[in-house]
């Protein structure tokens, strides 16, 4: 007697393959010649990375969850950049200089404009902010806040590097064709 699974009788695997979206993104990347990127975005990214040079030596080599879930793979560059640009907006609330925020805004908004994404990415609810534990001393809380700020800056630096790498990958791919 043949052992036939229920799901194969009703064709679920082929149905799932039909219903899965193609690996292409919903973003139509404009300015693939690189003029807008090189004249605005790359300048701001480089300014931000230059201002964060001293942070690199203090960063741990831990892998951030964002980069485990979102990578700049073939045919997914647009969605990676779109998500990364949205993530950059969260850093506008940090206590930083106006010049830093201006460059961050240019990269975030400029990337979003050049991507011309049509699909909406489902937003997540922001994580609930934890309250300080009453048993911890003031020094421990201060140390934890400093460590969190350093981790955020390390993530931001890595995010900017990944955005720059992804844009360069897109531009190199279009110049080869």
UniProtKB/Swiss-Prot annotation:
Belongs to the IL-7/IL-9 family. Gene3D superfamilies: 1.20.1250.50. It is found in: Secreted. Keywords: Cytokine, Disease variant, Disulfide bond, Glycoprotein, Growth factor, Secreted, Signal. SMART domains: IL7 (SM00127). Disulfide bonds join 27-166, 59-154, 72-117. Its main location: secreted. Interacts with IL7R and CSF2RG. Residues 1-25 form the signal peptide. Hematopoietic cytokine that plays an essential role in the development, expansion, and survival of naive and memory T-cells and B-cells thereby regulating the number of mature lymphocytes and maintaining lymphoid homeostasis. Mechanistically, exerts its biological effects through a receptor composed of IL7RA subunit and the cytokine receptor common subunit gamma/CSF2RG. One of its GO terms (biological process) is positive regulation of B cell proliferation. It is linked to Immunodeficiency 130 with HPV-related verrucosis: An autosomal recessive immunologic disorder characterized by susceptibility to human papillomavirus (HPV) infections that lead to the development of warts and verrucous or plaque-like skin lesions. There is an increased risk of skin malignancy. Some patients may also suffer from mycobacterial, herpes simplex virus (HSV), or fungal infections. Immunologic workup shows T-cell lymphopenia, particularly affecting CD4+ T cells. This is Interleukin-7. PANTHER family: INTERLEUKIN-7. The keyword Transmembrane does not apply. Glycans are attached at residues 95, 116, 141. GO terms for molecular function: cytokine activity; growth factor activity; interleukin-7 receptor binding.
